[in-house]
Amino acid sequence: MRKLVLTALIIALGACKTVPLTGRKQVALIPGAQMNAMAVDQYQQVLSESKVIKGTAQAQTVERVGRKIAAAVERYLTQKGHADMVKDFKWEFALIDENVANAWCMPGGKVAFYTGILGICQDEAGIAVVMGHEIAHAVASHGSERMSQGLIQQMGGVALQVAIKDQPEKTQSLYMTAYGIGSQYGAMLPFSRLHESEADKMGLVFMGMAGYDPREAPKFGERMAAQSGGNQPPEFMSTHPSHSTRIKDLNANMGEAMKYYLQTQQGQ
């Protein structure tokens, strides 16, 4: 009976979206506008409880790269007829002073980088690799997808609006874990390997369109592998395929990304 109720709920809400670039169908119980509104509150909460670095060369670099990737995303989606997917994004980029190799992007374009990952990035191109990957998660609504899955698993047949309005603490917990925001906010619910692979593929295209050489992505992967020393990868990479598989896949997906990159170099 529960499965029937859940199926009916999903159908009634028209809870199916398509991931740009890959074309994969996904479950999305929560409207994008609602996710974006929740992101504003949660993003401000994180920033208020963190040491945010402003005005330094590093902070300015993160902001600059973020703006270029965001512009590339908007350009790509416009070309594909999907400009509406990010029309309500209000991009923000914050650098948080914490020695963890982590970064994330909430719905609506709310991005955070942690200082602990900058050494692995090394330069703007490395930051673009991470930025493109994290923004791709938001564009592909991966967090919304796994939050929807969490609602189905944890709240059963409870109506969505009831779950959100009458169980705000549980909903907030699902939201925070769905976006993998630091351990102090609860256990991270990792992105699936499918999500990570999609974000890698999309991120390559976005960084290429922003004028950053996508061939830097496998190099970043090699530095990340060296950083992990064969142990558990840093938090934001925790559910990626193995380093060797990821690097192989990045190289395999290089063709389309390089096409966009070369166009930017030729002024097209």
Question: Could you describe each region identified by the protein language model?
Answer:
Residues L4-A12:
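Sec-dependent N-terminal signal peptides
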